[in-house]
Amino acid sequence: MSHTIRDKQKLKARTSKIQGQVIALKKMLDEPHECAAVLQQIAAIRGAVNGLMREVIKGHLTEHIVHQGDEARREEDLDVILKVLDSYIK
């Protein structure tokens, strides 16, 4: 079973939190708000997205790297995660 399926409820809860934060940001932009409050909301969204990414990466590393018995498959999975990290960190 894929770790994203096994952890589906936890991951969906995180995405719901992110969705709520984005909706709140959109409302803030429709009304007059201090720039600091808008920046704080953006930082909160970024933190929530980073937390989601961290959880999925941890699951991937555990499931597909640490517990992968096939060395060739482990190298393929590692290459995938490194490419994802490169694109995420850009």
From Swiss-Prot:
GO BP, one annotated term: negative regulation of DNA-templated transcription
A single cellular component GO annotation: cytoplasm
UniProt key word Secreted: no
Cell location: Cytoplasm
Keywords assigned: Cytoplasm, DNA-binding, Repressor, Transcription, Transcription regulation
Classification via InterPro entries: Metal_Tscrpt_repr (IPR003735), Metal_Tscrpt_repr_sf (IPR038390)
A Pfam family this chain is assigned to: Trns_repr_metal
Keyword check for Repressor: yes
GO molecular function, one term: metal ion binding
UniProt similarity note: Belongs to the FrmR/RcnR family.
Summary of the function given for this chain in its UniProt record: Repressor of rcnA expression. Acts by binding specifically to the rcnA promoter in the absence of nickel and cobalt. In the presence of one of these metals, it has a weaker affinity for rcnA promoter.
Record-given protein name: Transcriptional repressor RcnR
Organism: Salmonella arizonae (strain ATCC BAA-731 / CDC346-86 / RSK2980)
